[in-house]
Each structure stands twice: as C-alpha cells, then as structure tokens.
C-alpha cells in the first residue's frame, strides 16, 4: 500500500522482520540494539569433489565448523562454515550493540575471516555467488498481540540462539 491507498482488515498479522515497525507503532515493543545480532553470510561456489577433499568428506556427507574469538575481534558472536553440495556457506554473527561500540564495520569482519589462512585454504578458487545479511532477534517479545494485531516470526522474537544453533523455523511451523 502506498500513497493515499488504504487497506482495512479485522486482524493484521505482522511478519515484518526482527525490527517490526508494526509492533513498535502498536506499542508492543520499543527496540534496543542490545536485543539484536547481525548475521552476514557469503555463499562460495566450489565443485563438489573439491569440497569433499578439503573437508575430508565421503559423497553425500556434510560438515559444519563453528568459530569464536579472533574471528569477531572478540565481539560477542561467532563465525561458521557449512558445506553444501556445490558451495560453502560462510558467515559471521555478532551483537549489534557490541559492533557499534567497537567501531568496527561489519563487512570488515567477514573479510578478515575469509583471509584467515585456515579459511583461505577452504575457499581457495571459489567464487562468491551470494552475499546476504539479516537482523536476528536475541530477545523474545512479551506482547505478541493487541486488538487487531498478531506479531509472528522474527517480528515476535521467536528464535532461540543457543550459541551453536539458531532455531526459528520449527517455531514458525508449529
């Protein structure tokens, strides 16, 4: 809806992302940077056989590697490398407020991670085919509804970050 267009409904389902403007405008939540992380991911294309050799995998096997500490310049968060059939998913997740306080640019972290000698060996000869970033809620909302509005998904903070895994899709389906 744009301009002077109007849309009317008895109930609106707000699935407008982690920083839900609808939830904020309805008075359900005031957003604080400390309640969010930023995840940045690259997909690096490599032949399946190269991935199997570099990660010591048999056909149809996969691997996941998780990192903390230096990869984020000690900013709370971590990094990951996951194998896919013909690509690697490589990324960094850090708390937004800590990133702001550190005065580090987010893209610098993923560049530095890629240039680590251990990671360079894994991605050598690969081609970046996708880059994405996503705001990740780190705190659940207490108010998920009000008259005529239901907040769901990331907008509702329905994600569990255990530090090793991020769970959210199962909650969306439940």
Put a short name on every predicted segment.
Residues 1-124, 158:
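Predominantly flavin-linked oxidoreductase catalytic cores and closely associated redox partners
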Residues 73, 98-174:
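FAD/FMN-dependent oxidoreductases across multiple families
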């Amino acid at each position: 809806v744009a301009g002077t267009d109007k849309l009317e409904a008895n109930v609106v389902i707000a699935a407008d992302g982690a920083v839900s403007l609808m939830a904020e405008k309805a008075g359900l939540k005031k957003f604080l940077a400390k309640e969010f992380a930023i995840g940045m991911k690259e997909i690096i294309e490599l032949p399946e056989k190269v991935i199997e050799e570099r990660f010591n995998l048999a056909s149809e096997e996969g691997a996941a590697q998780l990192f903390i500490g230096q990869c984020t310049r000690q900013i709370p968060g971590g990094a990951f490398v996951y194998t896919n059939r013909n690509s690697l998913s490589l990324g960094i997740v850090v708390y937004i407020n800590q990133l702001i306080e550190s005065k580090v640019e987010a893209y610098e972290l993923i560049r530095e991670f890629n240039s680590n000698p251990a990671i360079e060996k894994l991605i050598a000869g690969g081609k970046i085919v996708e880059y994405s970033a996503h705001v990740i809620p780190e705190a659940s909302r207490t108010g998920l509804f009000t008259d005529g509005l239901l907040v769901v998904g990331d907008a509702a903070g329905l994600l569990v970050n255990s530090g090793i895994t991020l769970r959210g899709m199962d909650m969306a389906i439940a």
